[in-house]
């Protein structure tokens, strides 16, 4: 991040604090970025991160990736032989697209060898099977094979706090491989923690249906539930979906092989594989969508508290139990969110102390200064939140208010001429 881009981003957020503006109606079409050499990190910040809008990058951005060279046949189809030789005995998670479990699909685990055997038989049977349409989803290949030459992280997505945090703990990540036959799909959803995501088709094509933040509310049924499938004729039933006519049309994207889709924070979407497809997908959070993550966590806690409100007066340590339930349902609670902020903050404070000024998109002075500013805003809101004040922070180091003071001093120092 250069100085001019940081100034623009700081100015954008100065009036917002931890508020999250809506996007409103989807734009008429998705922007297409064709030339890597003509599109900078600053361009991405101005055009897409700040306004929280989607875009598609051309296949030129991924042409050097190892996965595109080795996982794909000359005809552009999945290279099953290579995948079997390299990963055949790896156990992978597989979803059944034909079975609805709440608003998702149930998963089973099998070896990649067994899944590819199924996939081949599915193709040979005219894309049909008594087992249904199975879709390999959420395979942590990069976590399990960290030295594999699979992809090169695009510079636009290099500020990735989620994976920076989980890499520091060395227990998990939010980098996934998806692979499935034509007709496999992912139901309507928004990404975890209201993160950004990027998705590259190593081979095959996808159809995306995207709705900007807030538009999903008009799609809820009369019970308040979001739809499982936004293409279902049931949405036309005005008795079941009384507000559906208020929903704007989705933004549609047909993503070709090699192309990269940027999905903004909080955009609900549904994705269909039009061909036999392999994709690489990352979820990521940084200073540009941190407030969205924080608002989402507050909403999740409120939902938990409402669900168990009848035990509020009778259950000892009710607030603590709500945090436990929240972590079980959402993958994180207020305590872990503080540790997430702390890990990123301490790394950025170190950069600022070393005054490692540099241009570009790397973790230099300007990027660290912007990050510290955003963490300060959100941490101040977290520290002031009544439910965080009930969390036992006696073992935290540093104490939340101490870290907040360090950050405020760093913000003042970074702003000094």
Swiss-Prot record:
Catalyzes the 2-oxoglutarate and iron-dependent C4-lysyl hydroxylation of ETF1 at 'Lys-63' thereby promoting the translational termination efficiency of ETF1. Belongs to the JMJD6 family. One of its GO terms (molecular function) is 2-oxoglutarate-dependent dioxygenase activity. The keyword Iron applies. The gene is JMJD4. Transmembrane segments: none annotated. Fe cation binds at residues 189, 191, 269. GO terms for biological process: positive regulation of translational termination; protein hydroxylation. It is found in: Cytoplasm. This is 2-oxoglutarate and iron-dependent oxygenase JMJD4. It holds the Pfam family JmjC. Residues 142-301 form the JmjC domain. SUPFAM superfamilies: Clavaminate synthase-like. The keyword Transferase does not apply. It catalyses: L-lysyl-[protein] + 2-oxoglutarate + O2 = 4-hydroxy-L-lysyl-[protein] + succinate + CO2. Keywords: Cytoplasm, Dioxygenase, Iron, Metal-binding, Oxidoreductase. GO terms for cellular component: cytoplasm; cytosol; nucleus. Interacts with ETF1. Interacts with the ETF1-GSPT1 complex. Its cofactor is Fe(2+). Its EC number is 1.14.11.-.
């Amino acid at each position: 991040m250069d100085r001019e881009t940081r100034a623009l981003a700081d100015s954008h957020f100065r009036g917002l604090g931890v508020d999250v503006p809506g996007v409103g109606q989807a734009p008429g079409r998705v922007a297409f970025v064709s030339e890597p050499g003509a599109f900078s990190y600053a361009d991405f910040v101005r055009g897409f991160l700040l306004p929280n809008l989607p875009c598609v990058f051309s296949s030129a951005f991924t042409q050097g990736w190892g996965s595109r060279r080795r996982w794909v046949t000359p005809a552009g189809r999945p290279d099953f032989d290579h995948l079997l030789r390299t990963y055949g005995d790896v156990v992978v998670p597989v979803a059944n697209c034909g079975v609805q479990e709440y608003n998702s699909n149930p998963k089973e685990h099998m070896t990649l060898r067994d899944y590819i055997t199924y996939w081949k038989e599915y193709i040979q049977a005219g894309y049909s099977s008594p087992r249904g349409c199975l879709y390999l989803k959420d395979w942590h290949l990069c976590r399990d094979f960290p030295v594999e030459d699979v992809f090169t992280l695009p510079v636009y997505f290099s500020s990735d706090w989620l994976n920076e945090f989980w890499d520091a703990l060395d227990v998990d990540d939010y980098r996934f491989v998806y692979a499935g036959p034509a007709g496999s799909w992912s139901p309507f959803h928004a990404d975890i923690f209201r993160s950004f995501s990027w998705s590259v088709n190593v081979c095959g094509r996808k159809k995306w249906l995207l709705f900007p933040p807030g538009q999903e509310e008009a799609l809820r049924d009369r019970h308040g539930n979001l739809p499982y499938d936004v293409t279902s004729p049931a949405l036309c039933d005005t008795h079941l979906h009384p507000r559906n006519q208020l929903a704007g049309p989705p933004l549609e994207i047909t993503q070709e092989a090699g192309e990269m889709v940027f999905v903004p924070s909080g955009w609900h979407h549904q994705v269909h594989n039009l061909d036999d497809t392999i994709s690489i997908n990352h979820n990521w959070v940084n200073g540009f969508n941190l407030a969205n993550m924080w608002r989402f966590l507050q909403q999740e806690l409120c939902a938990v508290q409402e669900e168990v409100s009848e035990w509020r007066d009778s259950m000892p340590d009710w607030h603590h139990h709500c945090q436990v339930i929240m972590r079980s349902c959402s993958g994180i609670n207020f305590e872990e969110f503080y540790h997430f902020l702390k890990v990123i903050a301490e790394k950025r404070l170190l950069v600022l102390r070393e005054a490692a000024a540099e241009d570009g998109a790397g973790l230099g002075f300007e990027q660290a200064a912007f990050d510290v500013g955003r963490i300060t805003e959100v941490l101040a809101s977290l520290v002031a939140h009544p439910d965080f004040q009930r969390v036992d922070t006696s073992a935290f180091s540093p104490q939340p208010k101490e870290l907040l003071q360090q950050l405020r001093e760093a913000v003042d120092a970074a702003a000094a001429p």
